[in-house]
Amino acid sequence: IAAYATAWQTCCSALKPITMSGLPDFLRSHTYPVLPAGISAAVLAAIAAFVVGLILMRLSGIAASISTLAALFILNVVYSNWDKVTMGTASIVGLPTYVTPWIAFAVAGLAMVIAYIFQKSSWGLALRATREDEVAARASGISVYWMRLAAFTLSGLVMGMAGVLHAHFLGTISVDTFFRRLTFITLTMLVVGGMRSLSGAVLGVVVISFVTDILRRMESGVSVSAQE
């Protein structure tokens, strides 16, 4: 959501009337600076997470997981067929590529700081209580529904920031960019590192990224002395 939102705002205004004619006039006819575009796109992702979370956070366990995955598939179908707004399955190109690895590292560090502060706050403690023992959390006066909704919305904001960075790092996006491959790689990172701690999530990212990079290099063959 955030990647497409920033693309609508920063893509060349000469191309949008042709390739994305269904956009509102204030998006179709104008190009906005990358910083306000990125911030507004991340906020839009948080709002979308809040709206979807109003329904999903009433579920728990495997039902919540399946419903969240179903929401991803529904969004993919909508974006894949919304030709006049998202260009369907085609790629949106010409985005300004202002994101460098150092900028990405800085924002990733900011995301970890936000997660750490939330983890150590009273809200983080209450959220962990809803995970460990939902009945006891309710008995303690914790609103399980609203705590989970707040965490889901905050996650939407952080993932929106990631989508903006991804779009302006590659300079092009498509619906396939954010579908099955990226989803399952992200889940794999969490499973490998551990989903119950911030350090585990970071470790999972490092390990899977390292393994992925090694395997990508091996695709072209491994050099042994002067021969491959």
Question: What is the predicted role of each segment?
Answer:
Residues 1-228:
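Transmembrane alpha-helices and adjacent helix-loop boundaries
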